[in-house]
Design a protein with these regions (language model features):
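Single conserved hydrophobic/aromatic residue that forms the stacking wall/gate
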Residues: 1-12
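Active-site groove signature of glycoside hydrolases
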Residues: 13-21
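Structural motif corresponding to alpha-helix initiation and N-cap regions
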Residues: 25, 50-51, 74, 117-118, ...
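N-terminal active-site wall of soluble small-molecule enzyme domains
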Residues: 26-35, 184
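Distinct, well-ordered alpha-helical segments
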Residues: 28-31, 51-58, 117-121
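Radical SAM enzyme [4Fe-4S]-AdoMet core and its adjacent flexible, acidic
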Residues: 38, 59-63, 70, 75-198, ...
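Flexible mid-to-C-terminal extensions adjoining Fe-S/redox cofactors in radical SAM and related proteins
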Residues: 194-196, 213-270
Length: 270
């Protein structure tokens, strides 16, 4: 709570509860309600989104919930998640969130195993989902291993998927976003009417770990700590040397995720 309350007199206005898996916290509803003067969002796999929890989150004024679904195919989803049976839990969570009146979006990290994204969009449309986002895999944590990196889609492959996805969304009235800097060509995204993603670490967003430590973004899982939100001033965190270094990136550099290991293939105008 102290980390949240420090934002009241400082500069940030949006609060996202993410993880790990934030629905494991028994005090999640309390934290959301405590943060009601922020624009609040919950990022989750959806498995623990019971009807009661969704109702409580709605009553606590949660502004939106983003649920991750890897595929319309239960086998593919469970394989990528690494847990058999997780697909059905996630789908039930999506249904419960929609039924509770929550503002729901569904994110799909794309790779070679789930590149039939059009079928996932059709499936989500059938559930009543109106807002979707997709991304490449972020090379952090377990996804930084050789197998995960090799499953990344090329810029060309991602472009083909996005082109088809944009057509489907226009036909169904869904809205689509793309969140991976450098994973798709800028010109293509502009032509499709999809906002061009740029790295916002240490500028438009930072992350706070469960023990109150500030890090550049939610995917930056190790190596850099910008300060302790429980005791350090926001000014000292904002002016940390790493923050300044990241914010000093030029426009071309910000079209890439700093965590990306291979940057030879550009997603810019080339």
């Amino acid at each position: 709570d102290r980390s949240v309350s420090r934002g009241l007199g400082d500069v940030y206005k949006r609060q996202t509860f993410t993880g790990g898996e934030p629905t494991l916290r028994r005090d999640l509803v309390e934290l959301v309600e405590y943060s009601r003067w922020f624009v609040t969002r919950l990022n989750t796999n959806g498995i623990l989104l019971t009807p009661d929890l969704c109702r409580e989150l709605y009553e606590a004024s949660l502004d939106s919930v983003q649920i991750t679904l890897y595929s319309w195919d239960s086998g593919i989803h469970d394989s990528l998640v690494g847990r058999k049976g997780s697909f059905h839990g996630t789908i039930e969570g999506i249904r419960n969130a929609l039924n509770a009146g929550l503002n729901v979006s569904v994110n799909t990290p794309l790779c070679r195993d789930n590149q039939d994204y059009g079928k996932t969009l059709a499936f989500l449309n059938g559930l009543g989902v109106r807002y979707v986002t997709c991304s490449g895999l972020i090379e952090t944590g377990n996804a930084s291993s050789g197998g995960s990196v090799s499953s990344q889609l090329s810029v060309r492959e991602m472009g083909e998927i996005l082109t088809a996805a944009a057509d489907i969304c226009r036909e169904t009235g869904m809205e689509i976003g793309f969140t991976s800097p450098g994973r798709a060509e800028v010109k293509l995204l502009k032509r499709l009417g999809i906002p061009v993603p740029m790295c916002g670490a240490c500028l438009s967003n930072m992350a706070v770990t469960p023990d109150g430590l500030a890090v550049p973004c939610q995917s930056w899982l190790g190596g850099v700590v910008l300060g302790d939100m429980k005791k350090d001033s926001w000014k000292s965190i904002w002016n940390h040397a790493m923050c300044k270094k990241i914010r000093a990136m030029g426009e071309e550099e910000s079209l890439f995720c700093p965590l990306r290991t291979g940057k030879s293939e550009k997603g810019g105008d080339t």
